């Protein structure tokens, strides 16, 4: 059964280690735990951050992090990052994590969700299936 828990100081170390493993072993990254901790901690401590971790049967599958943005006429959410760890990809975990995120931010009054994505087939397939509109391309 999938469950969602807030990203906190109690679970950040596990998120950091899985993040480093994922990006360094599957995406040719050069992350250190120190750099990953700084990146994740920066986002999760932003005022109005909304970050949580997805679990299935007690196993961490992925996480999402971002923050609310207030405007004069609407409230938005900026999705800083969504990560589904490699062994859980292409099994619906990303879709259910996005569904949970969308439900949470809608309950909090969000009318607009925005993100920046890598322009590759894998990411474009995911965002297209979620009905995101493609805006600017560099």
Language model feature labels by segment:
Residues 9, 20-41:
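Conserved GNAT-fold acetyl-CoA-binding loop/helix
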Residues 69-79, 89, 111, 135:
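A conserved beta-turn-beta hairpin within the catalytic core of GNAT-like acetyltransferases
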Residues 41-53:
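A short helix-loop-beta-strand connector motif used in the catalytic cores of GNAT acetyltransferases and
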Residues 84, 90-103, 129:
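Conserved acetyl-CoA-binding loop-helix of GNAT-fold acetyltransferases
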Residues 114-125:
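Conserved beta-strand-loop-alpha-helix junction that forms the acyl-donor binding cleft
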Residues 53, 59-68, 76-78, 83:
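Conserved beta-strand in the GNAT
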Residues 1-17:
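A short beta-loop-alpha structural element at the N-terminal edge
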Residues 127-137:
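Conserved acetyl-CoA-binding loop of GNAT-fold acetyltransferases
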């Amino acid at each position: 059964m999938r469950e969602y828990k807030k990203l906190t100081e109690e679970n950040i170390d596990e998120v950091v280690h899985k993040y480093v493993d994922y990006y360094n072993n599957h995406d040719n990254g050069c992350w250190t735990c120190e750099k990953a901790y700084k990146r994740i901690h920066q986002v999760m401590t932003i005022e109005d951050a909304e970050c949580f971790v997805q679990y299935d049967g007690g196993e961490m599958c992925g996480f999402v992090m971002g923050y609310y943005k207030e405007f004069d006429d609407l409230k938005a959410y900026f999705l800083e990052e969504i990560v589904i760890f490699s062994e859980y990809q292409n099994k619906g975990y990303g879709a259910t994590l996005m569904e949970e995120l969308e439900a949470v931010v809608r309950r909090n009054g969000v009318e607009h969700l925005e993100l920046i994505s890598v322009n590759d087939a894998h990411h474009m397939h995911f965002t297209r299936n979620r009905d995101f509109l493609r805006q600017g391309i560099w």
